[in-house]
Amino acid sequence: MGKKILKFSLDIIIIACLVAAGYFGLKIFERFQEDQQLNSSYESIRKDTKTGKHINWNKLKKINSDIVAWIYVKGTNIDYPVVQGKTNQSYLHTNFKKQYTYGGCIFLDSKDNKQFALNDNNVFYGHHMRNGSMFADLVKFREEKFARKHTIELYTPDKTYHLKAFSAYAKTADTSIPITFKNQEEKNAYITKLKNRNGVSSIIKNIPKKNEPIYTFATCSYEGHDYRTYVHAVEKISCSVCLLILEILCYYYIVFFI
């Protein structure tokens, strides 16, 4: 009798293990399929609306009027439309077609103005997907060589922003990231905090000047429980703008001094 009970118990345990393995295997397969579909949908929107640095904003707006920008980082998988929802939950697990997907979208904080120059701190969020998509490559900015050589490109209907990181680090999640500051002193104190957190020595020189907006990029990090990778950046003047300024200065020099 005892042997029968033992055999029955073992059979139950084996069946339970098989059911559990099947369930988790199915979930892993479903996540894999979902990730593949997510990558495919983003690849499709790139082909349909983006040629090099040219974005077809009319097409994008027809797909989703919540799209406010496009983010791109050379040498990474970061090449996505940026949306802004009514709340920060709107696109956490919703793609640009407004369909459920775990990977969601790259999104601008709902409290920010889509005109980036009007904000004290433009905050962007994205998932750190295990397959390397979305904001997974954001962690590369914590490497000296990568952070020094790479820029974050933000395309909007009105302007292209070239951003250089001035602080990059991983820490436990901030309960809230400031969007606005009461005054310059408060902003300076926040910038000092970011400088002290920074783990990449070569980029500290890029700190924002007075009245320059901060650009913050946040994603999950796997160093510890509830960790995040944060990258803070500032706009840099592009070479074309520098050349234009130089041409204007030369023109005035010729007119007034020669």
Feature map (PLM): residue ranges:
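N-terminal Lys/Arg-rich, disordered targeting/topogenic segments
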Residues: M1-K4
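Intrinsically disordered, low-complexity serine/threonine-rich segments
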Residues: K7, V241-I245
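Hydrophobic membrane-insertion alpha-helices, especially the h-region
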Residues: S9-G25
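Solvent-exposed, non-transmembrane regions of membrane-associated and secreted proteins
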Residues: A21-S238
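Cysteine-centered motifs
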Residues: C239-C242, C250
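Targeting/processing segments of secretory and organellar proteins
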Residues: I248-C250, I254-V255
